[in-house]
């Protein structure tokens, strides 16, 4: 067991050294990083990504840290409100003096802070977004990098899957944001010659408390395929609405919604509609018996038990948080024995990593002109209570 617990840290933690600090956030014994996550508010389900990352950093610290320094991760609740993200990010930079901003959740949230951080030349790394405005803008905002697969590429995967079926009539519900628009643009690209099979589109605002009118319009379109380019709260509402209408289309749901703590609610209230749903996956599912003997899943459970005992192991956002933290530790390790903001950015843009939290065959690769770390993803189908592979790995590049 001890070897299993150590293997991930051994891959990314180097021998201790005794050097004085110099860069902001770096002392002889610590590296301070920070970010915001929605612990409350409409996207509170995502809050676990901060807790999972924090638990992983504590595990790394318990095994020597990175180049002899312990990681201090300060994550604050922005309630998914970009204005709060700005306020709290300034606090992290100007009061906590962080080396870098890490793991900020949300596309609009990341966009709200990138000008400030790029002007100050502060790394904004591995944010919870796959938006083209961030991934494609490595020249205009070189200090900003997301972590999720390209939303556009995710949409392309769905479009190609739908295009391979006979006589699709497609209805689309999407968030009126770069997240939802990128997914929908990718969907249309993937549909190719069948882009005309989209018979209805409806948008919602991230602050909406109901999507009944949108779902009613989509239902009335007669579509036999429903694409949900949405966040978890609205995925649940959409499934419940389809169930209420007695509407049973083939459903594609965005990858940010596939955690068991989302789909268990859907399955309990709209089992027929949930069955056979399609999405993409890139991290392992620690609740799936397929991974029951996987060493990193065992590591994940042991880390939560020791460093976040109140966390639920079945919450996949905890697992994702550890996965993104693994990559951050790798970047910090390669930033040198005396890391600076510039050396950390260089390390983050030269990754070639096998991240054990990812599904087999998915690597973390970046270059100064490729800011989409996750290389591939897999189309998966919801079968009773778990997601199973529905197709080979596909490109997740922008």
Placement of each model-derived feature along the sequence:
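Extracytoplasmic "Venus flytrap"
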Residues: 21, 25-54, 76-83, 105-108, ...
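Beta-alpha junction/loop-to-helix N-cap segments that form part of ligand/metal-binding clefts
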Residues: 21-22, 32, 45-51, 62-136, ...
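Extracellular/periplasmic Venus flytrap/periplasmic-binding protein
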Residues: 83-87, 131-133, 140-246, 290-291
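Periplasmic-binding protein-like
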Residues: 92-105, 123-127, 169-174, 222-232, ...
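Extracellular/periplasmic periplasmic-binding protein-like sensory domains
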Residues: 242-320, 393-395
């Amino acid at each position: 067991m001890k070897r299993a617990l150590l293997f991930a840290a051994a891959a990314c933690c180097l021998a201790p050294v005794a050097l004085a600090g110099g860069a902001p956030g770096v002392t002889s014994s610590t590296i301070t990083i920070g970010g915001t996550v929605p612990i409350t508010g409409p996207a509170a389900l995502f809050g676990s990504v901060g807790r999972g990352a924090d638990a992983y950093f504590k595990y790394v610290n318990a095994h020597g840290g990175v180049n002899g320094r312990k990681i201090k991760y300060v994550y604050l609740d922005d309630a998914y409100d970009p204005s709060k993200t700005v306020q709290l990010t300034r606090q992290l930079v100007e009061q906590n003096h962080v080396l870098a901003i890490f793991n900020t959740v949300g596309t609009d949230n990341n966009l709200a802070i990138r000008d400030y951080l790029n002007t100050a030349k502060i790394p904004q790394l591995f944010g919870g977004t796959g938006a083209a405005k961030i991934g494609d803008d490595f020249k205009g905002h070189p200090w900003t990098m997301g972590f999720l697969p390209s939303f556009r590429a995710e949409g392309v995967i769905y479009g190609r899957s739908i295009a391979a079926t006979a006589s699709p009539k497609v209805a689309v519900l999407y968030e009126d944001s770069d997240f939802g628009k990128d997914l929908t643009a990718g969907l249309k690209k993937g549909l190719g010659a069948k882009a005309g099979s989209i018979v209805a589109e409806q948008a919602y605002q991230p602050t909406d408390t109901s999507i009944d009118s949108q779902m009613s319009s989509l239902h009335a379109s007669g579509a036999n395929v429903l694409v949900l380019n949405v966040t978890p709260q609205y995925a649940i509402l959409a499934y419940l609405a389809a169930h209420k209408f007695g509407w049973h289309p083939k459903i594609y749901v965005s990858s940010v919604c596939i955690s068991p703590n989302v789909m268990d609610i859907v399955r309990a209230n709209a089992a027929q509609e949930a069955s056979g749903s399609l999405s993409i996956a890139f991290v392992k599912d620690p609740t799936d018996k397929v991974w029951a003997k996987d060493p990193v899943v065992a590591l994940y459970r042991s880390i939560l038990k020791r460093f976040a005992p109140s966390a639920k192991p079945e919450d996949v956002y905890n697992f994702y948080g550890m996965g993104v933290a693994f990559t951050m530790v790798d970047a910090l390790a390669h930033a040198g024995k005396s890391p600076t903001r510039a050396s950390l950015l260089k390390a983050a843009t030269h990754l070639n990593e096998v991240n054990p939290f990812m599904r087999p065959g998915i690597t973390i690769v970046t270059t100064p002109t490729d800011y989409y770390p996750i290389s591939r993803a897999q189309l998966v189908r919801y079968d009773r209570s778990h997601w199973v592979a529905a197709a080979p790995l596909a490109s997740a590049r922008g």
